[in-house]
């Protein structure tokens, strides 16, 4: 089973159709009822959930094999109301994302961070919530085709798992592997000092 989160400009039906074609049962999540209605009109066979991911994902532990998020997570870096603190909203999302994924489950998060600091904040919170993984940048030298992905694994990857290779360059994989190593080393250091996965301050 797969779940998805989407921005206000896309809807769960787009990637949901592709996942369904590959035999997956899909649950689409969106903060906009209009986008959910569009997905329903397109004939998405799975379930739809009206939810603000900044308040956490409303699913049981170990529900999903994988998660796809398209152009949504970066919006958690902004505050629309006084009580909305970006780090807290990111923590609510990644903590619940971690626990609703099966151990070893994967999350592919496509995002558009406005600054390097935003990307660092997002990846840092994901790591503190127990994820390993890294950032892949497709076509980094193209303004139109450039895409940034946060590729996450709930827990440590198995030995046979190969991280995605970026499109449009042969050198980007080096930076990605370096970031992934950083994830693993920092995570092991935290565990050595007695911090459990999912503990975020």
Model-derived segments and spans:
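C-terminal lobe and adjacent flexible extensions of AdoMet/dcAdoMet transferase-like proteins
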Residues: 129, 139-201
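A short glycine-rich, Lys/Arg-flanked "PGG" loop and its adjoining helix->strand segment in the class I
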Residues: 84-103
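Conserved beta-strand signature within the Rossmann-like core of class I S-adenosyl-L-methionine
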Residues: 103-112
């Amino acid at each position: 089973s797969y779940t998805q989160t989407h921005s206000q400009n896309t809807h769960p039906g787009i990637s949901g159709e592709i996942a369904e074609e590959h035999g997956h049962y899909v649950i689409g999540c969106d903060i906009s009822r209009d986008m959910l209605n569009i997905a329903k009109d397109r004939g998405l066979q799975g379930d739809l959930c009206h939810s603000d991911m900044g308040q956490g994902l409303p699913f049981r532990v170990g529900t999903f094999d994988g998660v796809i998020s398209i152009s949504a997570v970066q919006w958690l870096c902004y505050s629309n109301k006084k009580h909305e603190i970006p780090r807290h909203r990111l923590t609510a999302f990644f903590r619940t994302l971690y626990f609703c994924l099966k151990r070893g489950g994967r999350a592919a998060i496509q995002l558009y961070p406005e600054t390097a600091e935003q990307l660092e904040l997002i990846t840092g919170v994901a790591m503190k919530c127990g994820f390993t993984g890294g950032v892949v940048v497709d076509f980094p030298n193209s303004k139109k085709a450039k895409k940034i992905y946060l590729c996450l694994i709930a827990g440590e990857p198995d030995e046979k798992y190969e991280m995605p290779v970026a499109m449009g360059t042969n050198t980007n994989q080096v930076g990605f592997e370096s970031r992934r190593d950083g994830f693993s080393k920092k995570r092991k250091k935290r565990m050595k000092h007695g911090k459990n996965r999912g503990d975020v301050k």
